[in-house]
Amino acid sequence: MKRWIVAAALGLATAGGIVTPGTAQASSGAWYRVYQADVPGSFNQTAAISKTNIWAVGDTYTTAGKTIYQPFVRHFNGSSWRAITIPHSSGSTADWVSASAASNVWVGGLKNNSTATTVVYRWNGARWVKIPVPAVTYLQGVIALAPRNAWAFGSSGTEAYDIFHWNGSKWQHYLANYINFIPQDISASGPDNVWVSGFAYSGSKQVVAAYRWNGAVWRPVSMPHPVFDDAGPDVTAVSPSNVWIGWYDTTTSHALHWDGHHWHTLTAPYYADPLHIVPDGKGGYWFGAQAILTGSTWTAEQVPAFTGGFGDVTRIPGTTSFLLNAGVEAGGSSTVKPTIFRFDL
């Protein structure tokens, strides 16, 4: 899901150095800015197909700070970022992007109305095609695995919480809210390994829970069910034997790791974001933009000092380079502008 960390002259270092529970190191890399659009707004999400095919979507605002309902889309072709116009898309936002190939790029957002209806467009390599969405249906966290295979969670006019599947012609409903499960995030490593994380109620408490699609049916995951009371839980499915679920409670960051046989519990340092866990390509994992976990060692990373906010980390496939979508004040102005940072390990 789209979540932001707000920064004000952001940095991790304190007068006494980096504060960590245990060993922390510093890498030789650094986040650096690679693109900033000259409009008020922010990037919500990026999707990298290759180092020469990257998509970014976001929101733009009026000078009064109101959202402009027109999808804000940028594409990187390996040498430059260019503006992309989706025909006949006025009246909607661009909240998320998902891509499995150059001919399968999905962009979605909300209509400018009071019914919370999602609008979805797919780039097929030649043109944009509008994907039909039932009225009063709100799709979040869409994972586009193929032109005829996409998963999402959200709500509809009949169900408060549900999981949806696109089969090439329509959206099908799977899990409904009567099962006592409220989805919060979705991730997939392939068509037979799709995970949805969320929470259930145990008495008056919220506990972490998950479901997995094995290619044929959704099943509840046998796992620990810790209590949480803040943000998450979010999921990263790297493979059937490598899955991470992260969340916050009031004071601490937590994660569960599935190694194919057992669940392992992890408490993360304060600068680690358990809602954005991404493999680093070297056997470690980014926890947001400011922490890398390799084995049991945490590496603290700094984002450049700025005022604004940033979202999730995206790995560029086939590389150890990463992108960070953000909204950053620039040029001495208080106007936040859509910005992309990059990190090379």
Predicted regions: what they are:
Residues A26-L345:
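Residue-level hotspots at or immediately adjacent to binding/recognition sites across diverse folds
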